[in-house]
A protein has these predicted regions:
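FIC/Doc superfamily catalytic core
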Residues: 1-196, 200-343
Length: 343
């Protein structure tokens, strides 16, 4: 895909408006799979793209799957729908209660985490769904440094500040929607208000902001996780280590992350444009990337699976009108590329 500026990508997107009902459904289905898979995969969820697709579209689990990962993916999709519906009610301001409700829906319930300390002793603590953290949290960076987030004591006030700032900034219109989303994301991450699920909530709220301003929702791809984290780290170097400074950072201070975020939005928006406008029977889309097959039979099999996730070889043979040996070869190649899952 050729490089486009954010402005040109948005212009191309605007030209497609209003979308037909069919295009809206196609885009929504694709985004649902891509967003949930990637946002959870970044955090260690082990479901494959194909398993995620079948789970979210058909409510079925194919192959071996971790029970908690299945539950997390399902809850993620419920939370995505909740966020999407709320974002459309533009007269309603963002509230900390809504953010905490999102978190409760995402985590579903309280649960206990068990860990082994360096001295060999066992420890445990409870993760509270929908409640701010009760213990300090931090991360070890790729450079080996410990990076502290806001303390439990200062978190409620910082979250209130963040939401109040956002609602006021939205009214004033000082920032573009993309700048507003990037700055909110960075400030939120520097607070890290919950003991788990902060990254997933941040990516949901980014799309909440974009949707409120009539921008298409975006996906932070798991395969680009290192670029995402490096952009946050580069901004941290400008802002400094004090959590409250990060929670009130300026757009100028986080410019490495803003630049990254603008490139991300441009790429994702233009990918949507291509997805809706490029029509070829040999073409398929997989996790935000265009796949061009040598034969249309590959994409025909994948299209069949969009309506029926569990197909027999005989059914495929009947639909394609080719011999069984050719069917098996096509299916094996699609499985080897992980475009379809082995049941």
């Amino acid at each position: 895909m050729r490089y486009l500026t954010l402005e040109k990508a948005i212009e191309a997107w605007r030209k497609l408006q209003p979308l037909t009902e069919n295009d809206q459904q196609k885009l929504s289905r694709r985004f649902t799979i891509d967003f949930n898979y990637n946002s959870n995969h970044i955090e260690g969820n082990t479901l494959t793209y194909g398993q995620t697709e079948i789970l979210l579209l058909f409510g079925k689990v194919i192959g071996e799957a971790n029970v908690k990962d299945v539950q997390d993916m399902t809850a993620s999709n419920v939370t995505l729908r909740m966020m999407s519906e709320e974002a459309l009610i533009k007269e309603t301001p963002l509230t900390v209660n809504f953010i905490r409700t999102l978190h409760h829906t995402l985590l579903r319930e309280d649960y206990t985490v068990y860990k082994q300390l360096r001295n060999g002793q066992q420890t445990s603590y409870v993760i509270h769904a929908g409640q701010y953290k009760t213990r300090p949290n931090s991360v070890i960076t790729r450079y080996g440094d410990r990076f502290e987030y806001a303390s439990p004591e200062e978190t409620p006030a910082l979250m209130t500040d963040l939401v109040d700032w956002y609602n006021q900034a939205e009214k004033e219109g000082k920032y573009s929607p993309v700048e507003l989303a990037a700055l909110f994301h960075y400030r939120y991450i520097r607070i890290h208000p919950f003991e788990d699920g902060n990254g997933r909530i941040a990516r949901l709220l980014v799309n909440y902001i974009l949707t409120r301003h009539d921008y298409p929702m975006i996906v932070v791809r798991s395969r680009n996780k290192s670029e995402y984290l490096e952009a946050l780290h580069a901004a941290d170097l400008f802002v400094g280590n004090i959590p409250s400074d990060g929670a009130h950072a300026s757009l100028q201070e986080i410019r490495p992350f803003v630049q990254y975020f603008k490139r991300l939005v441009a790429h994702e928006v233009y990918t949507n444009v291509c997805f809706l406008t490029e029509h070829d029977e040999n073409l398929w889309w997989y996790d935000g990337e265009k796949v061009e097959f040598r034969s249309s039979n590959y994409s025909k099999i994948l299209m069949l699976m969009m309506t029926e996730p569990v197909l027999t070889l005989e059914h495929i043979q009947q639909e394609l009108g080719i011999n069984m040996s050719a069917v098996k070869k096509l299916v094996n190649q699609l499985q080897d590329k992980h475009y379809i899952e082995r049941g």
